[in-house]
From Swiss-Prot:
Primary role: Component of the cuticle of migratory locust which contains more than 100 different structural proteins.
GO cellular component: extracellular matrix; extracellular space
Keyword Repeat: yes
Protein name: Cuticle protein 7
Native species: Locusta migratoria (Migratory locust)
High-level lineage: Eukaryota, Metazoa, Ecdysozoa, Arthropoda, Hexapoda
MF terms (GO), sorted A to Z: structural constituent of cuticle
Sequence repeat residue numbers: 9-12, 15-18, 109-112, 116-119, 122-125
UniProt note: domains: The tetrapeptide (A-A-P-[AV]) repeats found throughout the protein are also present in many proteins constituting the protective envelope of other species.
Top-level taxonomic group: Eukaryota
Annotated Chitin-binding type R&R domain residues: 31-101
The entry's keywords: Cuticle, Repeat
Entry-linked InterPro entries: CHIT_BIND_RR_consensus, Insect_cuticle, Insect_Cuticle_Struc_Prot
């Protein structure tokens, strides 16, 4: 005879209802404007840099500067617009003093502990006899 193991078909589930997501309207600004600037002067790392940028419609103007490792200051002035594309002019001014070298941090490796490999007894040898 047939022995039943007590198995049954998997239950059927209904699909979750689908709802249309409400998309937020995308706001288009035909004449965008912004202006930002920042600067960094970190005596500990020697990091010195600055940036300024403005946008009026489709025209972007800005500049950024940084101190090179030799102490000179590199300044890049740039413009971008639909007619001329992106244009940059780089200026370099000799520095009075070289930029401070980053602080060297000594890295000491932790000591490595060595242990002898464990010793094991020899594996038993098996043989056979032919009768």
């Amino acid at each position: 005879g047939v022995i039943s193991a007590g198995y049954a078909a998997a239950p059927a589930y209904a699909a979750a209802p689908a709802y249309a997501a409400a998309a937020a309207p995308i706001e288009y600004d035909p004449n965008p404007h912004y202006s930002f600037e920042y600067s960094v002067s970190d005596a500990h790392t020697g990091d010195q840099k600055a940036q300024h940028e403005t946008r009026e419609g489709d025209v972007v103007q800005g500049s950024y500067s940084l101190v090179e490792p030799d102490g000179s200051v590199r300044t890049v002035e740039y413009t971008a617009d639909p007619h001329n594309g992106f244009n940059a002019v780089v200026h370099r001014q000799a520095g009075a003093h070289p930029a401070p070298a980053p602080v060297a941090v000594a890295k000491v490796a932790a000591p490595v502990a060595y242990a002898a490999a464990p010793a094991y007894a020899a594996a038993p040898a098996y043989g056979y006899k032919h009768l």
